[in-house]
Design a protein with these regions (language model features):
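Active-site-adjacent "subsite" loops/lids of carbohydrate-active enzymes
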Residues: 282, 290-297, 337-370, 374-431, ...
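Active-site-proximal substrate-binding groove within the catalytic cores of carbohydrate-active enzymes
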Residues: 458-463, 467-692, 707-718, 773-775
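Catalytic domains of carbohydrate-active enzymes, especially glycoside hydrolases
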Residues: 300-325, 430-434
């Protein structure tokens, strides 16, 4: 364990044990206990753990430890304990073996659902040594586990055991236990009920470092909830026709297991934000193409800073080029970005030409620092630890002279760790930088220190940096994003998208709007981080909007000004809510409309305020959002997904339909979403129809345990607030529409009631007292109604022809396998009017090349053939009113350079006459049953009216 705070605690505990020893033999049985679990000991050995909530007992027989130091194997059972110390939260046993003192430290703090065990090694004389292997735990566990689930490959992150209730024959496990080391190198050996847990640090330890303290071994107990999800993320975006069948046939994880692991990680966080982090990442608008040494380039980047501030960001990476300070020809990294590092000073730092604690800041950099300070935004440095730093030959000795590219320092060496941290601190102090985005950090070289030592060095760098600069921003990317939650305790968050943000780096969800594609990937990443990597919301990364394409149609990565306009007018709000709903603490804001002057001017004050208000909302509700967790299931084709952030008798629910067809979301008002108490609730819509109350079919207010079933339009995000009902309300309560309600005598009057054009919702009103009404008017129109007790219901028809967002032309048929489809439709005049108004509000003069991207030019009326797992080798053809129409293929990487970015096929129907009957024929290729999702109109937003049809 390299956590400095824990080292200090352990050292103090050992000092107490020395000053206040107790006899090792003949002592009474010891126990550690808190409000959740009790650990019982037989002499110096752990004998049992008891879950005090459920009554489950895990019996632990022949518990032991072992370790290997300098090739010498030491087994705990062969040693005699010489001292023990019991405090309120710890139990320490000391053993002596030539030439070492070994201390075994058990700890159980208040609030923990787990016990930890560590080994501390102290040589009897000040000598250096090598720790080969740590086996902190070996035992025979009873009862026998009914089932087990390794975490990561071969259990390298830990293991889960499931146990039945009692001694019956139930096949449904009722209790669970997790066992893990706080590192990604767990090793397991089993022989019947006996098992050992170890890891092999193979790390050299100097006496000057102090005692060697092992990583904690954790054992947690918990009742299982019965709410299960896939234990591994469903590969993007594989079509699963029967989710229940898939769940039954594949490994599952219980939500209680996930929650227990998340709480274990949370207990050791070194960074606990009090407000949300808001950082802009301008390489997502290709800021590397900008040279801030030129006047035009500086003005362009100033727009980026200004816009980042306007949408509420506190930080922005600073990654444009500066030809006065660095050049491409001097780059020595594998990716060709070294000229952008450390505010363009990275090459000089590597070569020793500029030391941040000594050298002056160049004028062009000082100008940038001054501008950011005046705008009250902190600049974040993009930084690579794995570069050919030659200040000490020891660092790159492993590479045998082949340095540069991917070959950099050995992270297992303390000399480099200390030098690197010193440079990072000096740079912050010299420039006022807000923090770092670490990338190109290789910690798994084959010929250097052990992989554990390299990983441990990365962890030590991060923890030391956090200790020296407690408020620093730390964004962590390749490669340490792959090494699990114990790597990330000191950082702000790991990589926001699991891998690079470029469109080619991940499989695209089929959708014509890139921000929705990106949002679906973000929720997939958040699911993976929460459900497979057990990341608490405090350090879980969001991702807002997208990264624009860098390569042209010839597959050339452009370093000149290329695709500087790429704002997804109709997709960005879905992306904002997707990120907030899954990662409310870390708002990673990517592409913003700033580089292009036309986009910069067109982004309205209303949109800026909407953006800021939602980020502010997360700060206001942070106490509840700490409880954010998935509900319903993983993001996938053909299903709705969501999250809940609930505690006690209130909370929030975010629901997302990534599909184009309308689908239902279903969840229960109970512990599965975090609701712990209360009997009756109100559900209020926060988005899209702010202030609308959703009524229970059984009577307006919702009951504890009731199932909530809500229909979501295609591509819709729905945000709900749940709170205790106002059962004693003195005024009528209106449900399912926005408006006002009042009772005059025996007449119920609803005014300012709005509904989507062409819809027919059921309106509910819950009356106060025992009022019986004999008349109902809605917006001045008499309406028929029913009254049952206090509840009045009426179904009303709002005027106009229904033509909704993602308007469908074909009813989904799960048995359809391709072939000919015929459909007829009429486009209301109001739809073309809506498109014209949007073009007036967003008057960006797109080029023909711009419009290859289907998300640009949102004034166009597009018809999309939505296919799950689309294949661009299979053509779709269409005829309209008997004439062939051009069918275009859409790609999230725009030019089709990577086939996994194929989004599907569409036609542009912008030139059609309104209010005229049209006949469409579509010929689809042979498809697996159910993969064709339907035909949908794109770029339509809901429109509302107060006109009621009698």
């Amino acid at each position: 364990m390299s956590n400095r705070r824990d080292r200090i605690v352990c050292a103090l505990l050992v000092l107490i044990s020395i000053l206040h020893p107790s006899p090792a033999r003949g002592q009474a049985h010891q126990a550690l206990s808190n409000e959740f679990i009790r650990a019982e000991f037989a002499g110096p050995h752990l004998a049992a753990m008891i879950d005090l909530r459920g009554g489950f007992t895990l019996h632990i027989g022949e518990e032991d430890f072992a370790l290997t130091i300098g090739g010498q194997a030491i087994k705990g059972r062969t040693l005699t304990s010489v001292k023990t110390q019991r405090s309120g939260t710890t139990y320490i046993i000391e053993y002596r073996t030539i030439p070492y003192i070994v201390k075994v430290i058990y700890e159980l703090r208040p609030g923990w659902h787990f016990l930890t065990k560590q080994l501390m090694i102290e040589p009897l004389s000040p000598v250096d040594y090598r720790v080969n292997e740590i086996q902190a735990f070996g035992a025979a566990l009873q009862p026998a586990a009914q089932d087990e689930l390794p975490l990561s490959a071969r259990g390298s992150w830990g293991i889960l055991y499931r146990y039945p209730k009692g001694t019956g024959s139930s096949r449904i496990p009722a209790f669970g236990a997790f066992l893990l080391y706080q590192n990604p190198f767990n090793l397991w050996a089993k022989d019947g009920q006996a098992m050992t847990a170890s890891y092999a640090p193979e790390i050299d330890w100097k006496a000057a470092y102090g005692p060697y303290i092992s990583d904690r071994f954790c054992i947690g107990l918990y009742p299982l909830s019965g709410t299960v999800f896939p234990a591994r993320a469903i590969p993007e975006w594989t079509f699963i026709p029967d989710y229940a069948k898939y769940l039954a046939e594949n490994p599952r994880i219980d939500m209680a297991e996930v929650d227990a692991l998340v709480e274990c990680v949370r207990a050791f966080l070194l960074y606990r934000p009090q407000k949300s982090i808001r950082v802009h990442v301008p390489w997502c608008e290709n800021d590397y193409q900008i040279d801030v040494a030129t006047s035009d380039g500086w003005e362009e980047f100033k727009r980026i800073i200004d816009r980042a501030v306007e949408v509420g960001c506190q930080y922005t990476l600073f990654t444009p080029a500066n030809s006065e300070l660095s050049s491409l020809k001097e780059n020595r990294d594998a990716w060709g970005w070294e000229n952008l590092l450390f505010f363009a000073m990275g090459q000089k730092i590597r070569k020793g030409e500029w030391n941040p604690d000594q050298g002056p800041i160049p004028p062009s950099l000082q100008r940038t620092l001054d501008y950011a300070k005046a705008k009250n935004i902190k600049l974040v440095s993009y930084s690579y630890p794995s570069l050919p730093f030659m200040q000490n030959p020891e660092w790159t000795k492993w590479a045998a002279g082949k340095v540069g590219g991917y070959n950099g320092p050995d992270m297992g060496l303390r000399s480099f760790q200390d030098w690197w941290v010193g440079k990072l601190v000096d740079f912050v102090e010299a420039t006022g930088a807000g923090g770092y985005s670490f990338d190109h950090w290789w910690i798994a070289y084959d010929n250097a220190s052990s992989r554990y030592a390299q990983w441990n060095g990365c962890r030590r760098i991060l923890e030391t940096l956090r200790q020296r600069l407690p408020d620093i921003f730390i964004d962590g990317r390749q490669q340490y994003m792959n090494f699990g939650p114990w790597t990330w305790l000191a950082g702000t968050y790991p990589h926001p998208s699991l891998t690079d943000e470029q469109p080619e780096s991940f499989a695209s969800f089929p959708d014509l709007h890139t921000d929705r594609v990106s949002a679906n990937r973000q929720r997939f990443a958040a699911w993976t981080y929460r459900m497979q990597r057990f990341v608490p919301p405090e350090i879980l990364p969001g991702f807002i909007t997208h990264q624009t394409e860098r390569s042209d149609a010839m597959k050339v990565m452009r370093r000149d000004r290329f695709r500087a306009r790429d704002w997804d007018v109709l997709g960005w709000k879905f992306s904002v809510l997707s990120s907030i709903g899954t990662a409310p603490f870390n708002h990673v804001v990517d592409y913003i409309p700033a580089r292009d002057p036309d986009e910069f001017r067109a982004f309205s004050e209303e949109d800026k305020r909407w953006f800021r208000d939602w980020l502010d909302w997360t700060d206001t509700n942070m106490a509840l959002l700490k409880h954010t967790k998935p509900i319903i299931g993983p993001p996938m084709i053909g299903r709705v997904d969501g999250t809940a952030a609930c505690s006690g008798d209130r909370g929030f629910v975010f629901l997302f339909n990534p599909n184009h067809r309308q689908l239902d979301a279903e969840f229960a008002l109970n512990a599965s979403i975090g609701m712990e108490k209360g009997s009756e609730f109100m559900i209020e819509e926060l988005y899209p129809e702010k202030g609308r109350l959703l009524g229970s079919p059984s009577g307006g207010f919702w009951k504890m345990g009731e199932r909530v079933v809500l229909s979501l339009r295609g591509n819709e995000a729905l945000v709900l607030a749940i709170r205790p009902s106002d059962a004693a309300a003195s005024r009528p309560v209106l449900f399912n529409v926005c408006g006002m309600a009042a009772v005059t005598g025996r007449k119920l009057e609803l005014s300012q009631v709005e509904g989507e054009i062409g819809t027919a919702p059921e309106i509910q009103v819950l009356l106060p007292g025992n009022i019986r009404i004999n008349a109902l008017t809605i917006n001045g129109t008499d309406v028929q109604f029913r009254q049952a007790g206090k509840l009045v219901t009426a179904r009303v028809q709002f005027a106009g022809d229904l033509f909704a967002s993602s308007q469908a032309l074909w009813k989904y048929d799960p048995s359809f396998t391709g072939g000919l489809i015929r459909a007829s439709f009429t486009i209301p005049h109001r739809i073309l009017d809506q498109l014209r108004r949007r073009q007036q509000r967003w008057p960006v003069p797109y080029t023909e090349d711009d419009l290859i991207a289907p998300w640009l030019g949102s004034h166009r009326l597009l018809l999309y053939a939505h296919v799950a797992e689309p294949d661009d080798a299979k053509d779709v053809t269409m005829t309209l009113d008997g004439k062939s129409v051009q069918v275009r293929k859409a790609y999230n990487n725009i030019y089709g350079n990577n086939k996994r970015n194929f989004l599907g096929s569409y036609v542009d129907l912008s030139s059609l006459e309104p209010d005229r009957h049209h006949i469409l024929e579509v010929m689809l290729p042979q498809l697996a049953a159910g993969r064709f999702q339907g035909l949908f109109f794109e770029n339509i937003e809901p429109e509302y009216t107060r006109e009621i049809v009698k």
